[in-house]
Amino acid sequence: MSEKLYPVLAEAKRNTLIDNATYLEWYQESVSDPDSFWAKHGRRIDWFKPFTKVKNTDFNGDVSIKWYEDGVTNVSYNCIDRHLKSRGDQVAIIWEGDNPYIDKKITYRELHENVCRLANVLKKHGVKKGDRVTIYLPMIPEAAYAMLACARIGAVHSVVFAGFSPEALAGRIVDCESTFVITADEGVRGGKPVPLKENTDTAIDIAAKQYVMVNKVLTVRRTGGKVSWGPGRDLWYHQEVASVEPTCDPEPMNAEDPLFILYTSGSTGKPKGVLHTTGGYLVYASMTHQYVFDYHDGDIYWCTADVGWVTGHSYIVYGPLANGATTLMFEGVPNFPDQGRFWEVVDKHHVNIFYTAPTAIRALMGAGDEFVTRSSRSTLRLLGSVGEPINPEAWEWYYNVVGDQRSPIVDTWWQTETGGILITPLPGATDLKPGSATRPFFGIKPELVDNEGAVIEGAVDGNLCIIDSWPGQMRTLYGDHKRFIEAYFSTYKGKYFTGDGCRRDEDGYYWITGRVDDVLNISGHRLGTAEIESALVSHHSVSEAAVVGYPHPIKGQGIYCYVTLMTGEAVQDEDALRKELTQHVRKEIGPIATPDKIQFSPGLPKTRSGKIMRRILRKIAEDEFGALGDTSTLADPGVVDDLIENRQNKK
């Protein structure tokens, strides 16, 4: 745990929306009188019919979560129409293509026309309120148009990340019984084509065998690549939008009408369809976007996520657009054409707020500072981190090298299930500690419990629960409320269990230690894998590390470390470096954390969103690599063969 403290920067203090006194006052009100607090902030969005009820939630029994339940609104209206009078000609979306020479700016007025036309296409082909529409698109403006067009007519969108396999896509089509799919001929990532239409055709065949029939496929022409065509089923996007009216009235939606389903991996079985609804979700996404990122009118805001993940839903599309912001959508990858791409985009579009994942930060740190320092980055005012705990070494590099020590970092903790950020610093209010998500956002009541469910106070390690609802919370798992209760409310009765381990320090700051299934029990001691990974990465030779447990005859679990070295770091003597790293970890954490196995690897198995697939690493560490399951979602499946070949635990 980093002992360093970075006080709020003087510049941030002067200009931010929330200072520490305001944070403490608002937070107190939000937890002592949530009805009054959320009634006030619920009015940040426009309502066709104002709500009179605010909070109606119960984490016990059948678990029921309702916010603003008698209010009527529309998400698309809030993200577009209400801005037209005052900012119709302001840029809503900056699109930066995979190719660094291609970009596009879309104003709010243009966004309105594009969304209305697509909404009319959906209606023309029989899509109605409540129908599920699957969106399988790359990071192109049409992905945002598709989400907003669904919201406009009351259809429920299910966005499937364009890196997912046909099998994964089919599973998601079948689960929500979607009959309309929006895709592209191909996607482009790092200069390489991705066969989206072909994948869609395969997925539709798989779904048909499970008696779910897709009637229409609307295809965006992104590359002009050759695609197969099903007459009567397949439609070209450009032809369809040209054939309809450019205006479409937004459908009045009850606050608790579904907005979207987004599938997230369960620790067991098939993916879970997380369901978010209309009113509370938008209030929470827009409020967190404004205060966490200290968004001011005129800021250029860039979240590097993909719309296929919840971060893209809440912090590329819905939160920023509800706030009338200019949001940047990036089609490419951080290392194409080279490792300086992020910072070139920052300079090119004068980005003020930059939000990315620790995995990207660590990869770019491993490539060397010169890719960063050759850019100016003078417009950057705020940096953000999302997706997993950020190790202090990567935090320091991000702060010192990328941010030139003048941009606060908001290290945000949240989940697909939470709809928006739950624990985070606020740039003008929170002193920072590298690696800590710091304090709860307004209305969030974290609690740490031990394995028996007893509440533990003070500076302790425990299981992170949230004991009361907030407007952005998921309402259920689509079609499976029983599984929803079992997954989130049965482990600790009456509490939402996050599945994450957490440490609270003497200052009341929260440190996420990783998924509870990523917590090792070494000779009866709890150790978070994130902590050991952080120790390894603090060594000058190490770019990235992943740690898993494996069965150990004496200690119960042993510590197995996968280590990727810095670019250009050649290992003369593997055994000597293993000893050095082992000593380094002992020094950083203590003898209890001594690694049992260290395997050097050119890369780690990651999904295309940058998440490390720990399930695969655990299987290899256990020498059980015969049943690795679906590896089709990996960015580079070839990494797995190297890991198996060089495993340290061969029986």
Swiss-Prot record:
Family named by the database record: Belongs to the ATP-dependent AMP-binding enzyme family.
Domain of life, per lineage: Bacteria
InterPro entries: Ac_CoA_lig (IPR011904), ACAS_N (IPR032387), AMP-bd_C (IPR025110), AMP-bd_C_sf (IPR045851), AMP-binding_CS (IPR020845), AMP-dep_synth/lig_dom (IPR000873), ANL_N_sf (IPR042099)
Swiss-Prot/TrEMBL cofactor(s): Mg(2+)
Modified residues (N6-acetyllysine): K611
Enzyme type, top EC level: ligase
EC number(s) from the headed UniProt entry: 6.2.1.1
Annotated keywords: Acetylation, ATP-binding, Ligase, Magnesium, Metal-binding, Nucleotide-binding
A molecular-function term among this protein's GO annotations: ATP binding
Protein name: Acetyl-coenzyme A synthetase
Catalyses which reaction(s): acetate + ATP + CoA = acetyl-CoA + AMP + diphosphate
Sequence positions that bind ATP: G387, E388, P389, D411, T412, W413, W414, Q415, T416, D500, R515, R526
Disulfide bond entries: none
PTM per Swiss-Prot/TrEMBL: Acetylated. Deacetylation by the SIR2-homolog deacetylase activates the enzyme.
Sites where the protein binds CoA: R189, G190, G191, K192, T311, N335, S523, R586
GO biological process: acetyl-CoA biosynthetic process from acetate
Described purpose of this protein according to its UniProt entry: Catalyzes the conversion of acetate into acetyl-CoA (AcCoA), an essential intermediate at the junction of anabolic and catabolic pathways. AcsA undergoes a two-step reaction. In the first half reaction, AcsA combines acetate with ATP to form acetyl-adenylate (AcAMP) intermediate. In the second half reaction, it can then transfer the acetyl group from AcAMP to the sulfhydryl group of CoA, forming the product AcCoA.
This protein's GO CC annotations: cytosol
Keyword Acetylation in record: yes
Residues bound to Mg(2+): V537, H539, V542
Pfam family, one: ACAS_N
